[in-house]
Amino acid sequence: MRVLMLGWEFPPHISGGLGTACLGITQGLTEKGVDLTFILPSMKEEEAGQSETKLRSASGVPISHALKKAVERVRHQQNYDEFSELLMRPVNARLHPYGYDYSQSVDANAFNSDDIAEISHFHGGYKDDLMDEVYRFSTAAAAVVLEENAKKKADVIHAHDWMTYPAATIASRLSGLPFVAHLHATEFDRCGDHGWDVIYGIERDGLHAADHVIAVSERTKRIAVERYGVPEHKVSVVYNGAFLNEDIPTFEIPEAIKNEKRVLFMARITFQKGPEYFVEAARLVLNEMPNTRFIMAGSGDLLPRMMKRVAELRMGSQFHFPGFMRGKEEVYRMYSMADLFVMPSVSEPFGIAPLEALQCGAPILISKQSGCAEVLPAALTVDYWDVRRMADRIMDCLNYPVMAQESLRQCQADLQLLTWGRAAEGILAAYSHVCPNA
């Protein structure tokens, strides 16, 4: 089976769980014998040779006039004409859902014609010009898909999250290949009911354009069905996995903090991850257990507000902000030094971080609003908004380490079932809905 996969990030350049999940998925599928090419906006030339996955960059790909016109026709049919206007200013309007069964073949030589209309370059990532990059990537990625499909016939296009849905939709319409959308997170997860209608529209259009949808949890499937109107039969649930064979180094805890209890939050410091609830729970814990150290590792738009709140509560000596952790060793060091890892997410589609914490031997306390709670029944859970209960749970774990260790032991046993190989089997089953003969 041959898969052309579209993604926005891939190790070593990641900003969160999406890149990690893409790595696990590609490794799992490759081990199952899948011929897979991963297409992303940009990468360094040397990275293509270092990765076990076949990587293709859409940066610098020539776009012929013929292909550009074909893409524009698809955009018109898919109501993407208004997308270009959204690049100039934020607007409060939904994109229309797809309402056409449209397919058009393109000459296999259209992508490499000498008559070049444009060449796009991308930096990737999530900068201020993200919408512009998403728009241009939809053309460049389509060119790469057509080229790869001409080299060797593919069976399916698999696209990760909203940034790649327009590209996958256009590539699918031009190539005739089925499109599977992988839903790792939604605008409702990221922003609650106050998200950007433009992104919601792109997500909704992409999920309706897809021939099949993969959701990372039952929670995410419910959102796809109830908030995006995706037919329930069109959505398969495939849980993420963990890198179980990875060697976890051991770390010495510095003498200066050996006698303290350490509670860790490590995530993007944004609305979705619930950092404010962690800060308020820390206040309640420190009132009763002042010999506790809280760590909030990560970066994000709420970081300044969290630092200000910690200062207002006069917790600076016991609450630390080490910043974004770069590299696996730094991440593993933080987990390994923690007596408890807390994930108080407001809405977490799955949550790979708790799996990593468990691998490093850290007990976990996760919100009931997280997808990974579905597959970790022994995990300690709390409603993200119940700060008093969260503080009590934290103190229970710190005061009764036997209880925390028993939860850890049971969670680590459940973790053995969460392999990327098992995830790959679920993805292959999802593919069978759209390409049964592959």
Located regions from the model:
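Conserved donor-binding/catalytic core segment of Leloir-type glycosyltransferases
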Residues: A256-A282
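Conserved acidic donor-binding segment of nucleotide-sugar-dependent glycosyltransferases
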Residues: A379-R388, D396-P401
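Short alpha-helical donor nucleotide-sugar binding micro-motif in glycosyltransferases
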Residues: F324, Y332-A338
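A conserved catalytic-core segment of Leloir-type glycosyltransferases
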Residues: T37-K151
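Carbohydrate-associated surface elements
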Residues: R219, G241
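Aromatic "clamp/platform" in nucleotide-sugar-dependent glycosyltransferases that forms part
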Residues: V346
